[in-house]
Amino acid sequence: TSSCAEYTPYIQTVTTIFMALFGVNFTVYFLLLQRKFRQALHSSELWTYVGIILTATLAISVNIYRSMPSFGQAVHHAAFTVSSIITTTGYGTLDFNLWPEFSRVILCFLMIVGACAGGGFKVSRIVILCKYAKNELERLIHPRTVKVVKVDGKQVSKETVHGVLVYTLFYILIAMASMLLVSLDNFDASTTISSV
């Protein structure tokens, strides 16, 4: 039941790196195999994913460092847990239920992202939604502006954007309905939200 907690910090660090690497969109690896390094490294999805991991790791590290022997250990455990949660791998070095509420909420958001091929909302959809939202905000300021959603310099079709919006709507509705069903068992809000 101790998951990866029994392993040395070195093995945990290697596991962290590989969990994070395998959460990257497989298209990036395909581009690297084709020696299209510039195109692979300019992937907005890749940098959004890296940004999410780094931001979450830093925020959680700062939040939990008082309960750790050193800031380095806080970063170590935060990075491992963030990589595990965002990739839906499920490994652990510590019981993050003992962490402050702020850190657990961040982990709940990361569970939704689900960067790997196995499940979750996906970083690519987040990128498309953010670019669409930016275009809509610009349209509020300049109503005659005609904007298209572009990802990595390529136009995303209206059908794809529409599909992402519909998927997002249903994702939220199903999550809310599931939370309501789980709440019938009188769990606290944190348990209800994280169990969905």
Please provide the spans of the model-predicted regions:
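Membrane-proximal intracellular helices of multi-pass ion channels
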Residues: 1-196
